[in-house]
């Protein structure tokens, strides 16, 4: 934890304290019509977050009638449409400590899977390709596979790449119908 965020700093000299920096999700859209709509005909089915879904809404999950009445999907959408995602589970991340080297930056931490799950359901269709140009330990590719998408990741650091391969194999085992992701990879 950063020293300026520690309670001890407040006790010793609060002029040195600070507040935590927020994470930001930047969304870029290409102008024009989307030729392949991302549809949810029975609403949003799964919630990625820490809040408990109210029990009375569960009967609406997968509701096939008018989506105006789908209170389950509406509840999930209100969480996702919020300007602040304060319900993201900070500890829901892939293993990463084994990939760290001594000379790594101190800020290295994988993206939370709740954020990835939300992005995948909102901005991609099952079966589509998801690209992550900074793969790290493979969180986005892992999430893509679990969500029924194909993931393409680029990583320069060998220790991160090796951890990503392990993490992605776990996603593959969770989704055996996806086929062998590494059938053509020479691991030597």
Predicted regions and their residues:
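Core catalytic lobe of class I
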Residues: 1-162
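S-adenosyl-L-methionine
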Residues: 165-188
């Amino acid at each position: 934890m950063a020293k300026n965020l520690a309670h001890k700093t407040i006790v010793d000299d609060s002029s040195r304290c600070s507040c935590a920096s927020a994470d930001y999700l930047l969304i870029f859209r290409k102008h024009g019509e989307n030729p392949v709509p991302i549809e949810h005909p029975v609403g949003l089915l799964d919630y990625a977050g820490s809040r408990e879904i109210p029990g009375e809404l569960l009967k609406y999950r997968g509701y096939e009638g008018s989506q105006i009445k789908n209170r389950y999907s509406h509840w999930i959408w209100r969480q996702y449409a919020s300007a602040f995602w304060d319900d993201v589970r900070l500890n829901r991340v892939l293993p990463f400590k084994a990939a760290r080297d001594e000379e790594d930056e101190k800020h290295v931490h994988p993206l939370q899977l709740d954020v990835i799950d939300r992005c995948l359901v909102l901005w991609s269709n099952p079966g589509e390709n998801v690209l992550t140009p900074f793969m790290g330990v493979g969180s986005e590719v892992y999430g893509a596979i679990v969500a029924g998408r194909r993931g393409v990741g680029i990583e320069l650091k060998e220790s991160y790449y090796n951890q990503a391969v392990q993490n992605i194999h776990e996603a593959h085992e969770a989704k055996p119908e996806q086929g062998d992701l590494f059938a053509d990879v020479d691991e030597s």
